[in-house]
C-alpha cells in the first residue's frame, strides 16, 4: 500500500521534511517587507509578511488641507495593494515548498 518495505517510514520522513521547510518559509515570510502604492506612487505603504504596517510614505504635494480625503483614500488603497502583494508572495513561496501539491479547498497555511 505504501510502496513496500520502508514506504511508510519514507512517507513520514518526507512529511517531516516538508513541515520543516514550511516552518522555515513561514519565518522568512513573516520577516519580509512588501510596499504597495497608490496615486502613481504619491502614497506608499510598506507592510511585513504578517500584515503589520512598517512604514507610510506620503508625497509632500498631498499635505494640503483640501487634499485630506484624497490622502486618506490613497493610504487605504496603498495598504490594500501591499496586502494583496504579500498574499501573492506567500502563495508563491508556499507553492515552492509544497512542490505544487494541491491543498484541500479552503486550506489555509498557519500564518
UniProtKB/Swiss-Prot annotation:
Q: Which UniProt keywords apply?
A: Cytoplasm, DNA-binding
One cellular component term (GO) for this entry is: bacterial nucleoid
Q: Known SUPFAM superfamilies for this protein? A: YbaB-like (SSF82607)
| Origin: domain of life | Bacteria
Which is an annotated GO molecular function term of this record?
A: DNA binding
Q: Where is this region: Disordered?
A: 1-23, 89-111
What InterPro entries does this protein's entry cite? YbaB-like_sf, YbaB/EbfC
For this protein, the record's Pfam families field holds:
YbaB_DNA_bd
List the subcellular locations: Cytoplasm, Nucleoid
Subunit structure as annotated in this protein's UniProt entry: Homodimer.
Q: Which family does it belong to?
A: Belongs to the YbaB/EbfC family.
Q: Give the protein's function.
A: Binds to DNA and alters its conformation. May be involved in regulation of gene expression, nucleoid organization and DNA protection.
HAMAP family the record matches: DNA_YbaB_EbfC
The name of this protein is Nucleoid-associated protein VF_1686
Organism classification: Bacteria, Pseudomonadati, Pseudomonadota, Gammaproteobacteria, Vibrionales
Amino acid at each position: 500500500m505504501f510502496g513496500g518495505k520502508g514506504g511508510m517510514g519514507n512517507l513520514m520522513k518526507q512529511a517531516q521534511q516538508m513541515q520543516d521547510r514550511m516552518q522555515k518559509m513561514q519565518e522568512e515570510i513573516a520577516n519580509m517587507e512588501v510596499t504597495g502604492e497608490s496615486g502613481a506612487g504619491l502614497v506608499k505603504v510598506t507592510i511585513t509578511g504578517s500584515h503589520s504596517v512598517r512604514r507610510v510614505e506620503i508625497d509632500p504635494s498631498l499635505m494640503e488641507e483640501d487634499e485630506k480625503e484624497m490622502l486618506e483614500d490613497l493610504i487605504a488603497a496603498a495598504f490594500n495593494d501591499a496586502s494583496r502583494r504579500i498574499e501573492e508572495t506567500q502563495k508563491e513561496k508556499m507553492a515552492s515548498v509544497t512542490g505544487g501539491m494541491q491543498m484541500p479547498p479552503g486550506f489555509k497555511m498557519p500564518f
